[in-house]
């Protein structure tokens, strides 16, 4: 009986931790749905869409998910915190040029994946200065390269 209690308490703790994580972080399916909605909005009105993405409005702020877009040269044109940032300078801890890969894999009508590592600042409550693996779903729509990233772990 004692082992059952230990097992049950351990299972309960793991279950609570995993549910807490899933509430904070979006899934691949949720990211894909958001990217598809973002593409539709860009096709309808690009300027309006980029403003909505930057302001994180219109349902484009779900858990930790948000769409972002860059022009063909890699400059972010729609992003909640980094409009004007050059994606080509985004290099992860493994030395991978993430921005360059975004530009290379983006194709009209197709969603491709770019996986990379990212560390968040210590003052971010969810992350506590831990490195995470993320995957961005990337596509091209008109003259924009757009993506939504989700955590893998």
Where are these regions (language model features)?
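Bacterial N-terminal signal peptides that target proteins for export
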Residues: 1-7
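N-terminal signal peptide c-region/cleavage motif recognized by signal peptidases
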Residues: 17-20
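Extracellular/periplasmic ligand-binding regions of membrane signal-transduction receptors
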Residues: 25-51
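Soluble sensory domains of the PAS superfamily and closely related sensory modules
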Residues: 35, 45, 98-122
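Extracytoplasmic/periplasmic helical hairpin
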Residues: 42-69
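Extracytoplasmic ligand-binding sensor domains of the Cache superfamily
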Residues: 60-109
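Sensory/regulatory domains in signal-transduction proteins
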Residues: 112-153
